[in-house]
Amino acid sequence: MKFVIKLFPEIMIKSESVRKRFVKILTGNIRNILTKHDETIAVVRHWDYIEVRSKKEENRPHLIELLGRIPGIHHFLEVDEKPFTTIHDIFEQTLQDIGTSLENKTFCVRVRRKGKHTFNSLDVERYVGGGLNQHIPSAKVQLSKPDVTVRIDIENDNMMLIKARHVGIGGYPIGTQEDVLSLISGGFDSGVSSYMLIRRGSRVHYCFFNLGGAAHEIGVKQMAYHIWQRYSASHKVRFVAINFEGVVGEILEKVDNGQMGVVLKRMMVRAASRIAERFGIQAIVTGEALGQVSSQTLTNLRLIDEASESLVLRPLITHDKEQIIAMAKEIGTDDIAKSMPEFCGVISKNPTVKAIKAKIEQEERHFDFAVLESAVQNAQYLDIRQIAEQTEKEVVAVDTVAVLSAQDVILDIRSPEETDEKPLNMENVQLMPFYKLSSQFANLDQSKNYLLYCERGVMSKLQALYLKEQGFSNVKVFRQ
């Protein structure tokens, strides 16, 4: 099984030295991700493409899924590579491989060729196309907008029949740009802005300001872990959690109501700048969009930036909310965001849309900065992979079972896409995506025991912890 990886076009127009560096990094990223799932993987880089081979045909669907989420890949081709001797041999092998798929369809043949041959690309197109037309009575040649385009690449004595073309996410390979620190709240905006910087080639670390207790932190960890695992698992990243409840309390007590939103954001970027400086991170990322809420006017954003010692990036600055939600759906964070409370928005009842610097500074003089200093000093730092390990320690009170009793119901909490792709074929299974547990679990028959199931056990244990904290004792984790 072979895939041919085509590079993001902007990589190809770089200088030779930069392009080589980008391709080398992308090759390493592909290898890091795929070898975790298939030990037979071989990844080889060429001048303008990357070749991926596997000996395990059964891994094909999973490898396609993984390659489709690696930044730097524009598209990739599934190919069947074989040696050939003559132009007639090319036709016979093509007929054998795809003949049945052309029945009752229109088609054309497109060929690209490298090397020395007694024929050119057009000769092959005519010969193979004519042969297929003669041997498949129900098929018909149509050069303009055919049902099927038969694509063949020829290089020296080998032919590659392109069986399928898959679209990648594009962008630059992670590691080609410098690291950034994303301020993640678990909402639509911060998840999408994090993804946009990942796609642009930055390793994205996460900084979370906890305003809502353990349940809020669990939800944000789920989102950060989801984004990392899905789009940037080739790299280690940090998850930083800062308890901001004391800072919020200080603001509520000492800052004028209309200035609270801007002051809170200034405190956040101050703290994030300290974290970024500690790890040599060049910029912080926020999900702010111009005019979306009162604190996101140009005047207010400028005042917020002045509190930061780091560059502040806002990739969503011109995006509409509708566009942001659509992007969240594409990357799979929308359902998590829907279940996440928005704590920042309720801190100020009459927020200013055009804060005055002197007024803000006057209000901040009432603030005890020792509270902010304490919050930063007591920040918790995690390798994002430790979220799974931390879950093992935190959910010690949740039993893990493999055998069902009469009162047990398996609650499959995977996303609808996962359950459709890999259904759990067992008895007594109910589907309830993890993001609906908080609102719908109480509606279930509470005389039953519910065994939460997800593929890796991370999400099920995080949700078990949450439900236990909400007072539900009939929760366990199911592992096959």
From Swiss-Prot:
InterPro entries: Rhodanese-like_dom, Rhodanese-like_dom_sf, Rossmann-like_a/b/a_fold, ThiI_AANH, ThiI_fer, ThiI_N, THII_Thiazole_biosynth_dom, THUMP_dom
Active site: 454
CDD domains for the chain: PPase_ThiI (cd01712), RHOD (cd00158), THUMP_ThiI (cd11716)
Chief localization: cytoplasm
Positions of the Rhodanese domain: 404-479
Domain THUMP: 61-165
GO-annotated biological processes: thiamine biosynthetic process; thiamine diphosphate biosynthetic process; thiazole biosynthetic process; tRNA 4-thiouridine biosynthesis
Alphabetical list of Pfam families matching this protein: Rhodanese (PF00581), ThiI (PF02568), ThiI_fer (PF22025), THUMP (PF02926)
Top-level taxon of the source organism: Bacteria
Record's catalysed reaction(s): [ThiI sulfur-carrier protein]-S-sulfanyl-L-cysteine + a uridine in tRNA + 2 reduced [2Fe-2S]-[ferredoxin] + ATP + H(+) = [ThiI sulfur-carrier protein]-L-cysteine + a 4-thiouridine in tRNA + 2 oxidized [2Fe-2S]-[ferredoxin] + AMP + diphosphate; [ThiS sulfur-carrier protein]-C-terminal Gly-Gly-AMP + S-sulfanyl-L-cysteinyl-[cysteine desulfurase] + AH2 = [ThiS sulfur-carrier protein]-C-terminal-Gly-aminoethanethioate + L-cysteinyl-[cysteine desulfurase] + A + AMP + 2 H(+)
Gene Ontology MF terms: ATP binding; CCA tRNA nucleotidyltransferase activity; tRNA binding; tRNA-uracil-4 sulfurtransferase activity
Catalytic activity, EC: 2.8.1.4
Cystine connections: 344-454
Function: Catalyzes the ATP-dependent transfer of a sulfur to tRNA to produce 4-thiouridine in position 8 of tRNAs, which functions as a near-UV photosensor. Also catalyzes the transfer of sulfur to the sulfur carrier protein ThiS, forming ThiS-thiocarboxylate. This is a step in the synthesis of thiazole, in the thiamine biosynthesis pathway. The sulfur is donated as persulfide by IscS.
Protein name (record): tRNA sulfurtransferase
Species, as recorded: Pasteurella multocida (strain Pm70)
Lineage: Bacteria, Pseudomonadati, Pseudomonadota, Gammaproteobacteria, Pasteurellales
Gene, per the UniProt record: thiI
